[in-house]
Amino acid sequence: KQTGEAYLFDVAYYEGHYYVYFGVLPVLLFYLPFYLLTGSSFPTAIGVLIACIAFVLGITALMDRFARYHFKRVSLGLFLLLQIPLVGCSGMLYLAKFPTFYSLPIALALAFTVWGLYFWLHGRSSERAWGWYLAGSLCMALVVACRPQFIVFSLLAFPLFWRKFITEKHLFTPKGMREFICLLAPYAVVAAGIMLYNRAR
């Protein structure tokens, strides 16, 4: 400000380059493909809308899976009574109302989180759990490429899987070991990709 030089807000400047702290996944999913196809900037509001819809669908699927796993019957009225405030309290309505550059990584991280939890829960009651675990962990790992702080939701894996893998010693069986690898592998792959990206830039 003192010298009158132009600068960008809320970014880091290091050795002649600007850096943002948000993950790169929104760029890879929306901005870059749209730019390559049209030569124009991607409308951020559309991306936020897509992420919001994905979140609502995901939270609905997650609640349905949770209800089926823990309760025999849940009325539609009770389901909606729980779903509506859950969506309202998630912050998604605020993100939809203000679809800015800041909103998209957060909305996308929330969407990947609920779908990741859904896949994990589905895997717990499936004979072919490895595929569900793989999909769930991929979603949860991709959260880091959107909004890194949301990786804390991955800690829910401990209460979800501790009994099966540790208490019941499923981890020490060939099938359990394969499933456990499917839970961990996506994190390793996504982490390697993010580290390579950071090194390249």
Question: For each predicted feature, which ranges?
Answer:
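Specific aromatic-rich, kink-prone transmembrane helix
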Residues: 107-126, 135-140, 154-157
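Transmembrane-helix signature of polytopic, membrane-embedded enzymes
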Residues: 59-91, 111, 126-135
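Perimembrane helix-loop-helix junctions
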Residues: 152-187
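Transmembrane-helix motifs of polytopic, lipid-linked glycan transferases
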Residues: 42-72, 112-119
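Juxtamembrane membrane-water interface segments immediately following transmembrane helices
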Residues: 1-12, 18-22, 177-201
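Juxtamembrane segments of multi-pass membrane glycosylation machinery
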Residues: 8-50, 68-73, 95-99
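Structural signal for the C-terminal ends of transmembrane alpha-helices
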Residues: 63-68, 120-125, 159-169
